């Protein structure tokens, strides 16, 4: 929430984010996904937001505050726009993990621990067991692990038992620390993460 407040106070708007994505998409061919809150989508107009996201080159949408039971409010519109509504799976019962995984699109975001996003010194959840349950229900769906991954060692550990590691808050903190000069430190950090993740091979 702190990062969101700073973005808003800095003049960031949804349309400005769309413009940034449009420019990035001109040089980047990798899939790109928005992670935002449902109220951002609602306030822009759900269908309008999703159509615009697809237009500028977004491939999927993660709404961490929308539980599985409420996803049908967004899923048909995402499908119509050509976007994957990405499922998040937290440490929970085996039956629930399999239920969510069975209908997952794009990839599954495996939440490493309960709580809010951010940097953690240690991740204790048995991610390997979660991933195995997901694959039992949906063998072809990729699983990426997020929440609390901030170091190359953590990324390597998570990638060893899943298909990838998601890093967010650590990069935002580099933006906060270096401001307009953040591109270099971010690039260095991402490269170190990439090297660590590839160690699993």
Residue ranges and their predicted role:
Residues 1-2:
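Short, small-residue-biased leader/transition segments that mark boundaries at the very start
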Residues 31-45, 86-92, 120:
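Active-site mouth loops of central-metabolism enzymes
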Residues 56-62, 67-70, 112-119, 147, ...:
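Glycine-rich phosphate-binding active-site loops on the catalytic face of alpha/beta enzymes
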Residues 92-102, 137-138, 149-165:
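Catalytic cores of alpha/beta
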Residues 9-22, 42-47, 63-80, 93-99, ...:
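Active-site-adjacent beta->alpha loops and helix N-cap segments on the catalytic face
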Residues 53, 100, 158, 168, ...:
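Conserved, mostly hydrophobic/aromatic
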Residues 173-201:
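C-terminal helical cap(s) of enzyme catalytic domains, especially alpha/beta-barrels
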Residues 32-36, 61-63, 85-88, 108-110, ...:
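Hydrophobic faces of well-ordered beta-strands that scaffold small-molecule active sites
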């Amino acid at each position: 929430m702190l990062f969101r407040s700073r973005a808003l106070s800095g003049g960031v708007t949804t349309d400005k984010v769309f413009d940034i994505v449009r420019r990035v998409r001109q040089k980047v061919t990798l899939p790109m996904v928005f992670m935002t809150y449902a109220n951002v989508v609602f306030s822009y107009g759900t269908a309008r937001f999703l159509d615009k996201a697809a237009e500028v080159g977004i491939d999927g949408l993660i709404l961490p505050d929308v539980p599985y039971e409420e996803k049908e409010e967004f899923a048909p519109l995402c499908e119509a726009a050509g976007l994957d509504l990405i499922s998040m799976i937290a440490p929970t019962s085996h039956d629930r993990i399999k239920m969510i995984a069975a209908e997952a699109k794009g990839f599954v975001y495996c939440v490493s621990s309960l709580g809010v996003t951010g940097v953690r010194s240690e991740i204790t959840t048995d991610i390997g067991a979660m991933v195995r349950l997901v694959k039992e229900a949906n063998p072809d769906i990729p699983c990426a692990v997020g929440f609390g991954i901030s170091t190359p060692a953590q990324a390597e550990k998570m990638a060893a038992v899943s298909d990838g590691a998601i890093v967010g808050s650590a990069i935002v903190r580099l933006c906060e620390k270096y401001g307009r000069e953040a591109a270099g430190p971010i690039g260095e950090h991402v490269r170190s993460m990439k090297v660590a993740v590839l160690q699993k091979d």
